Amino acid sequence: MTDFVIIGAGVVGGFVARALSRYNVSVLLLEKENDVAMGATRANSAIVHAGYDAKEGTLKALLNVRGSEMMEETCRELGVKYKRNGSLVVGFNDEDKAHLEELLVRGTKNGVKGLRVIDREEILKLEKNIGESVTVALHAPTGAIVCPYELCMAAVGNAMDNGADLRCGFKVTKIEKIDGGYRVWSGEEFVEGKMVINCAGVWSDEIAEMVGDTSFSVHARRGEYMLLDRECGDLVSHTVFRCPSKMGKGILVTPTVDGNILLGPTAEDIEDKTDTSTTQAGLNAIREKATEQVKGVNLGKVITSFTGLRSVGSTGDFIINSTTDGFINVAGIESPGLTSSPAIGEYVVDMLRDMGVVLEEKADYNPIRRPMHYFKELDIDGKNEVIKEHPEFAHIICRCETVSEGEILEAIRTNPKPSDIDGVKRRTRASMGRCQGGFCTPYIVELLAKELGVPYEKITKFGGESYVNVGMTKEDV
């Protein structure tokens, strides 16, 4: 029987697994999809929030500020790109200014450092392309950006390197109490764990109900985004928010750690927890709001649009508790969940200790993971040294993002291992550029088929029935 079964391999479940992998316990991470980071972690704003928005005294406030403090060192350990670019929450009138003053007071009470409300003249010194109607802003210099799915993959991979196990394609259908723990079912299969930690995102209320916990509910909030080409990368350097509302932090314009510009998200409460469609109304709202807060947004440079679903709990705060013996909820982790994720892992460990669980630290625990994009960051001499030993790094597969065969092969062989085209994309950025895989997809299919030992026709874009090949042309002629 496994010591800890964690349900949900998003960034929260990943960091809980990583935190527990430090100790002499067995950890099994379950994921219903065919890869990690497939829910909210895959599609969000990628912001490390400073911590001014969450109400004082809430878990959101506590874990936001702690997570923000931890994030830079965590990313350094995991080899994940991190950039402290600061953020601006912009206002357009006196009412907005009053709101920003409230956020300043709240953020200061939460322990956020360096917050200031600044006027238009000072805003323009920071961002020359700020919108013409912007009059005031809250400047948060500790705000930062990361790549959320890269962070999740690194956390899960580091946990696996330290002994944790991952099982994808395991959709939990039933949980039953047994002597000494729980039996967790997926159809006719099951695993057993002494304790279960529920990190199932929008599905966490349904998982909790399987053990009789109906103390909370979760609904999905749809957020749509547009991504601009790297050519637009110098549009802004800070993350530019609007004043937040009860629905979220509003439409933002932000650089990404990979050099693109991200616009969005919208905020729409929906019943269908699987609806990740984009809508004309949503994309129109992004266009209208983004061009109001930042001028020069070139909508002709949009290379893709997408939607993410946020997990909104009924309590208004993060739900991290244990209402049933041996079963822990980590639910309702909406924004600032990405920022808070390393701190949530730490918090769950402290919670377990308070529950009397003995955790003995491993002598050989290693928090360090080699950067996923280390080859890109080498200078020309460093790259040539790698190519001498491994010539596949000289063969460019994705021309838009300059991703080599060597990088793709390394990604396929590194925990957690991808099994489809989009999995390779998230790990290497191959097919993530201007042509969106128009050139490199056949080569990625070939490499995946060879490494996984399966026919081309079995390779999918994102799992399930998303096959990209139906046969070999020359054989069918």
Regions found by a protein language model. Give the residues of each.
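Short beta-strand to alpha-helix junction loop
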Residues: K55-V65, V90-H99, L138-G157, R167, ...
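Helical element adjacent to the flavin cofactor pocket in flavoenzyme catalytic cores
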Residues: L138-M195
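Dinucleotide-binding Rossmann-like beta1-alpha1 core, especially the glycine-rich loop
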Residues: A46-L126, G250-I251
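Glycine-rich FAD pyrophosphate-binding loop
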Residues: R22-A43
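Flavin-dependent oxidoreductases
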Residues: F15, I175-G264, E268-T279, E288, ...
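N-terminal Rossmann-like FAD-binding beta1-loop-alpha1 element of flavoenzymes
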Residues: T2-L29
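C-terminal catalytic lobe of FAD-dependent flavoproteins
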Residues: A154, G248, V257-D258, D269-I396, ...
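Iron-sulfur (Fe-S) cluster-binding segments and ferredoxin-like electron-carrier domains
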Residues: T274, S404-T414, G438-Y456
